[in-house]
Swiss-Prot record:
G4, as annotated region: 167-170
Keyword Nucleotide-binding: yes
Name this polypeptide is given: Sulfate adenylyltransferase subunit 1
Chain residues that bind GTP: 33-40, 112-116, 167-170
Keyword ATP-binding listed: yes
Function (record text): With CysD forms the ATP sulfurylase (ATPS) that catalyzes the adenylation of sulfate producing adenosine 5'-phosphosulfate (APS) and diphosphate, the first enzymatic step in sulfur assimilation pathway. APS synthesis involves the formation of a high-energy phosphoric-sulfuric acid anhydride bond driven by GTP hydrolysis by CysN coupled to ATP hydrolysis by CysD.
Similarity comment: family membership: Belongs to the TRAFAC class translation factor GTPase superfamily. Classic translation factor GTPase family. CysN/NodQ subfamily.
G2, as annotated region: 91-95
Length: 494
């Protein structure tokens, strides 16, 4: 930012005519990092420089900043975010604050997450819906343990795009060597997380350098993008990659002639005539109608709240999942997962909890397997997990559970664990896959592999006998050419 721009920074920017947004999909991002790295100040600066601050907010900011000005005489931009009284008194972020801003290229939803270790669970909440993480690092302090913890949680929650915002670079006299060392250290750590898409930016959130406007006047050695330029080029995760998913929230029966299944589409798309399967029962039906509040739709996509009407009477209850018949989630009694422990009592080995995913709630036994060592990025064996620990666990269900892996569908691959005694939410988790060493398909005894026409297979799967033993089966739909290749490569005695 130029000296002239800095001098005039306390003046509310003049309003400009609204510009067309080229990408209509908002980018959801979080700011995270350790305590006092400048997360709230950065978002406040973003809001200010993108003209997302209203006149009354600007006046309040000027008033509340009285007596709190820094050495540059600039407002305390963090006050635009820290809304709780406790946050203002302590000068920290506790809750997750969501703010909205836009440029002429796209719109953004940003979550300011707390940096203190005891509020890690709040950070996990903010990360669960984000497409990109802005990880702040104090240029004077480098990578800290909480920095690693937040990066790990963001990665586990499916975030693959990171901006490493090396903040307060002005307090190091714009030290290029320090910036490059921090960038190198983080990239080395990120390799253990499988994160490769990292943009490192030196910046001063307070001065606004490399946030919205270029800081090249102060840092001629940096020729990369600003934060906003990076955000404008980021990609939004799509829920269309998997097949149709609808977690039934309510069965609607306003009259004898109507029966519909209500919920929000969690993946893919659906249209009248599509064949669907109800899980965990395995019953098959066709979609006859898609209804919203006041319309009959010819299609629905992820994010739409709909009422689905089927062409036959089937047993569907709240918590069941209606899915595309040719792209099914995993169903079984045992799954692997990764969790973040959220309560002081942690996760006790072998204890039974309530697991809630979507609108379905089931009893589950949780067995900790390993805990992530944040300093090394390695997994160490563990029998219990305490608050803020990141761990791998084995989930064992009494009845068949239905999930997608979290990296394929956030909605149908995530869950929370509830203590049945206290009703506290003790963990948030992500399904990594169905356990390969458990379940009916691996029981002793012979197995039979069949290759059937799709219509015949649908009839068999709709039978009561098949439905009663659905958790003992594995179904894979392939093309005729793929089936021929499988059988050609199979052993001769199959």
């Amino acid at each position: 930012m130029t000296a002239a721009a800095t001098a005039n920074v306390v003046t509310l920017p003049a309003s400009e005519p609204a510009k067309a947004v080229r990408d209509t999909r908002p980018l959801r991002l979080i700011t995270c990092g350790s305590v006092d790295d400048g997360k709230s100040t950065l978002i406040g600066r973003l809001l200010w420089d993108t003209k997302a601050v209203k006149e009354d907010q600007a006046a309040t900011l000027q008033r509340d900043s009285t007596g709190k000005q820094n050495d540059l005489g600039l407002p305390d931009f963090a006050l635009l975010l820290d809304g709780l009284q406790a946050e203002r008194e302590q000068g920290i972020t506790i809750d997750v604050a969501y703010r909205y801003f836009s440029t002429d290229k796209r719109s953004f939803i940003v979550a300011d997450t707390p940096g203190h270790e005891q509020y890690t669970r709040n950070m996990a909440t903010g990360a669960s819906t984000a497409d990109l993480a802005v990880l702040l690092v104090d240029a004077r302090m480098g990578i800290l343990e909480q920095t690693r913890r937040h990066a790990t949680i963001a990665s586990l929650l499916g975030i693959k795009q990171f901006v490493l915002a090396i903040n307060k670079i002005d307090l190091t006299n714009y030290d290029r060597a320090g910036f490059e060392k921090i960038s190198h250290d983080f990239r080395e750590f990120a390799l253990s997380l499988g994160v490769k898409q990292i943009t490192a930016i030196p910046m001063s959130a307070l001065k606004g350098e490399n946030v919205v406007y270029s800081g090249q006047a102060a840092m001629p050695w940096y020729t990369g993008p600003t934060l906003v330029e990076t955000l404008e080029l980021a990609t939004v995760r799509s829920a269309q990659a998997v097949g149709f998913r609808l977690s039934v929230q309510r069965v609607s029966r306003p009259g004898e002639s109507f029966r519909g299944y209500q919920g929000t589409v969690a993946g893919g798309s659906v249209k009248p005539g599509d064949s669907v399967m109800i899980l965990p029962s395995g019953m098959v039906a066709n979609v006859s109608k898609i209804v919203t509040f006041d319309l009959v739709r010819n299609a629905a996509v992820a994010g739409d709240a709909i009422t689905l009407v089927l062409d036959r009477q089937v047993d569907v209850s709240r918590g069941d999942m209606i899915v595309a018949i040719d792209s099914q989630p995993q169903s079984g009694l045992s799954f692997d997962a990764q969790i973040v422990a959220l309560q002081p009592e942690g996760i006790e080995p072998g204890k039974r909890y309530w697991l809630k995913s979507g609108s379905r709630r089931q009893r589950v036994q949780v067995q900790p397997i390993a805990q992530l060592e944040l300093k090394t990025g390695a997994w160490a064996p563990a029998q219990s997990l305490w608050m803020n620990a990141i761990g791998k666990v084995r989930l064992s269900f009494d009845e068949a559970a239905v999930f997608d892996p979290y990296d394929q569908n956030r909605s149908t691959g995530s869950f929370i664990l509830i203590d049945p005694e206290s009703n506290n939410t003790v963990a948030g988790g992500m399904i990594t896959g169905k356990r390969a060493d458990l379940g009916g398909i691996h029981k002793d005894g012979q197995r039979v592999l069949l290759s059937l026409p799709a219509d015949l297979a649908d009839q068999i799967m709709a039978s009561e006998l098949f439905s009663s033993r659905r958790d003992e089966t594995e179904v894979r739909r392939v093309t005729a050419a793929q089936a021929a290749e499988i059988w050609a490569n199979a052993a001769s005695d199959i």
